[in-house]
């Protein structure tokens, strides 16, 4: 709904915001990547891999990632599963994620939140105690 130039400008601004957030704050997971705020997925995933940030594979919003699957996998980033369940009947339902993993040959050792693999998160105690410095 906007010009190509405007779209590219928005993608650049959004991408820079994601990169800055990962550098400045103890981010653990990027959720809904490319769902509403379009970004350069490859660049964001490369930074996420570098910073130890998971990228969510969201049951409801996988369509936003389909065309970027190869770049995401090639970046080396780890993934975490999210069902986006807004209904208790949908909790734990990951069939679309399983299909995505199979379709794009996502290495299962890099997918957390399934197969009993729990993600690990950064300790935020020091960050919280020193938040005024940020």
Stretch-by-stretch model annotation:
Residues 1-4, 33-36, 58-62, 84-88, ...:
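Active-site beta-loop-alpha junctions enriched in small/polar residues
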Residues 29-31, 55-57, 79-83:
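Hydrophobic faces of well-ordered beta-strands that scaffold small-molecule active sites
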Residues 1-53, 100-112, 121-134:
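Extended substrate/RNA-proximal surfaces in nucleic-acid metabolism proteins
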Residues 90-92, 98, 109-116:
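Catalytic core of soluble alpha/beta enzymes
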Residues 9-11, 59-76, 125:
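Short, motif-level signal for alpha-helix interfacial/capping segments enriched in acidic residues
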Residues 71-74, 78, 99, 103:
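Short basic/hydrophobic patches in alpha-helices and adjacent helix-turn junctions
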Residues 37-44, 64-68, 91-95:
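Active-site-adjacent beta->alpha loops and helix N-cap segments on the catalytic face
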Residues 77-92:
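Short acidic/histidine-rich active-site segments
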